[in-house]
UniProtKB/Swiss-Prot annotation:
GO CC, any one term: extracellular region
Name of this protein: Uncharacterized protein EXOC3-AS1
Renumbered residue ranges of the record's region Disordered: 23-100
Native organism: Homo sapiens (Human)
Residues listed as glycosylation sites in the UniProt record: N44
Leader sequence segment: 1-18
Ranges of compositional bias, category Polar residues: 43-71
Compartments it resides in: Secreted
Assigned keywords, A-Z: Glycoprotein, Secreted, Signal
Domain of life: Eukaryota
Amino acid sequence: MPAVFMLASSSALQCGRGVPRFPRTEVGAGHSVNEETKAEKVGNQTSVIPATSRQAALGTSWTQRRTQPLQERSHWHPRGNNASGMGGHRMFPGPLRGPAAQVLENECGSLGRAAEGRS
């Protein structure tokens, strides 16, 4: 059970870490406004191309950001005796301990159970 919780909390932390990153890409959002105004002059097809390429670029940078903390965590947090029960609780910041954390735990808890069933 503690192993499942550790897995759930680490993936929940990852979910939580990914959420604030999206609003920070407002530079890209502002960029799309420029693209749309250009597209009105030229035509619809021009707006389609930059949007997809921007999404592709966003996708790659997001996956890189997402895998990096995982690799770091695996160094100082092997899935062995270190996975003590309270260690998982410490991963969650204080303010998050609420309905939002509950939702994250529920979603990622099912992920953990699925992963445990697979192994």
